[in-house]
Amino acid sequence: NASSCCGMFSWVTLPEGFQIGGLFNTRGIKDMNLMFAGCVMPKGFSLGDHFHTKEVEDMRYMFYQSSVSEAFDFGKIFDTSHVMNMEYMFSECRIPDGLKFPERFLTAQVTNMDHMFYESVFLGKADFGDGFVVSPGTNTNDMFTDCMFGDEKIDNQYNQDFNYVKSRLS
């Protein structure tokens, strides 16, 4: 059994209509480092109903430098309740208007959010949901440094202030 999907879809352009189907089994995977890094996703791309993440501990660079598609869907079972490292997870990403983080995008146990959204471009609103929190002691160095809200660059005095960013994108 595999324990890592590291780099699986890195730096590829997924074809129009591509979906992760029911035969793609991620149960037991602990490491999704770089899984979709640099990936260009087709419009409406979904991780689907079989993309298990409940056992994953490491999502470093998972979507680093990717172009997240319009109407991207994390799927019904995307669960980050055991993830401890989200370093650079969405860094240098293009994040579409209306991106909704799933209900099970839970971050209370994450200890490293260093550069999580560094230099990302938010093209509009984003719904982080209620489970996305920053716990005391979590490394948030440069979490939002040099991010763009449309054409406006974030003032770096807020580069570690999740509540400020969340209010700006709501």
Region locations from a protein language model:
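Negatively charged
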Residues: 1-170
